Regions:
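Non-Sec secretion/translocation targeting segments of pathogen effectors
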Residues: 1-5, 134
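Pan-zinc metallopeptidase signature
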Residues: 5-9, 14, 154-193
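Auxiliary, metal-adjacent structural segments of Zn-dependent hydrolase domains
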Residues: 10-87, 107
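Short, surface-exposed acidic
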Residues: 40-52, 147-154, 178-188
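Active-site recognition of the HExxH zinc-binding catalytic motif
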Residues: 91-107, 131, 135, 139
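Extended compositionally biased segments used for macromolecular assembly or nucleic-acid engagement
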Residues: 111-114
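Post-HExxH zinc-binding segment in Zn-dependent metallohydrolases
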Residues: 117-166, 174
Length: 193
């Protein structure tokens, strides 16, 4: 399916392309956020900036209930809801830029891995857990603090009360067991550690 068909199927309509200067500004800020938030991963801020500045970014009309930003792996692009204030784009870009960093394709452009998600088998494995790991990393990077929430009659603390709160809590428990470095290294670099 073509990119245009994929967008149409999802109800995403591109309304504008972000200027090079805006993309560069977002890329610079996200690179700084990731490098300073995860020093143990030894991100090179300048290399990360150069990589992230290559991402095509768009404003789009998106259906109600969709995320405010969406990463489309087929064309390695980010689509921001046109209703997001410009000053908030970087906040939403962090999550999608992590998806960009974790994308692994074969020489024909077929997606093989996306962080903890393995697409090399007949069935997709780890998609939900990868999304939660990316949201956990995003919350850490943005300096989110624990908040108490109640879902399904369960009260618990989570670093991400509005986005995947229960699964982010599970990711935090996994990070406690494996060590946060190992979990996030696998998430950022699509490793099987």
């Amino acid at each position: 399916m073509s990119v245009e068909s994929e967008l149409k199927k999802e109800g995403i309509v591109v309304t504008s392309i972000l200027s090079s200067s805006k993309v560069n500004s977002i890329a610079r800020k996200v690179a700084n956020i990731l490098a300073t938030s995860f020093p143990e991963h030894k991100f090179n801020t300048e290399e990360l900036y150069i990589l992230l500045s290559q991402i095509p970014m768009y404003r789009a009309s998106v259906p109600k209930g969709f995320s405010e930003a969406n990463y489309l792996y087929k064309n390695c692009s980010i689509y921001f809801n046109e209703n997001i204030p410009t000053k908030e784009l970087t906040t939403y870009a962090v999550h999608e830029c992590i998806h960009y960093l974790q994308t692994r394709k074969d020489k024909w452009g077929n997606l093989l891995k996306l962080g903890l998600c393995d697409l090399t088998r007949f069935n997709v494995h780890g998609l939900g857990i990868n999304e939660a790991a990316v949201q956990y990393a995003t919350s850490v990077a943005l300096g989110s603090t624990l908040d108490t929430v109640k879902y399904y009659g369960i009260t618990f603390d989570t670093i991400s009360p509005n986005c995947y709160p229960l699964v982010c809590n599970l990711i935090a428990q996994m990070a406690y067991i494996t060590g946060e470095y190992v979990l996030l290294d696998s998430t950022f670099n699509s490793k099987d550690d």
